């Protein structure tokens, strides 16, 4: 859809654009010479100086020619490149000329939206950058204050303090020392309580081991006593037996004499 309109300027368009400067090209000078249309050659290389045409007639002729060429270029651009093109031109007399391959109003709304999005994006980025810069400045100031406070607490930055400030610092230090001592005592009490519990546990273990040792000693004594009783009984039994004939006799009685035993011994001696 290609639209070309030529009409008087209306306030309803809502778009005010500066009058485009005419573009001169070699050989396009209207009815007059190059000087009549505001294009003058400079030097030997054929450069053209663009300036306002003072003659009203020549200016109007040049406007009509250039306007037609501009509209033709806009049409070719929209067709060849499938681009959305909207062209709005106001003459020096206020006459409106426009061209659009879709709709001038829709193209203008699209332009406004794109321009607004770009502005908003840049605005958000700028706001974020400012916010981060402010936060960084606050953090730097906090770091500086903490460093000064630490130097003051260790007594390195008190030369410029008056009596009141020194008194306040002393109170803060006393309060801090009180908290430190309380925490230290708390840790010491906890350590002492732990050591006492550990001592009780070790005493219980020691008593248990002592009872085990005593029980083992009693068992060993019982075994030794049982072994000694068995040995004594065995010895007592051996005392009541004659080792020569294993005949039991009383130790209080004298052994009887047997002549046959002497004869047997003598006979055995003679044979040897």
Curated annotation (Swiss-Prot):
It is found in: Nucleus. Disruption phenotype: Abnormal flowers with floral-like organs. One of its GO terms (molecular function) is RNA polymerase II cis-regulatory region sequence-specific DNA binding. Expressed in the lodicule, stamen carpel and ovule primordia. Residues 129-219 form the K-box domain. The keyword Protein transport does not apply. PANTHER family: SERUM RESPONSE FACTOR HOMOLOG. Probable transcription factor involved in the development of floral organs. Acts as a C-class protein in association with MADS3. Involved in the control of lodicule number (whorl 2), stamen specification (whorl 3), floral meristem determinacy and regulation of the carpel morphogenesis (whorl 4). Plays a more predominant role in floral meristem determinacy than MADS3. This is MADS-box transcription factor 58. It comes from Oryza sativa subsp. japonica.
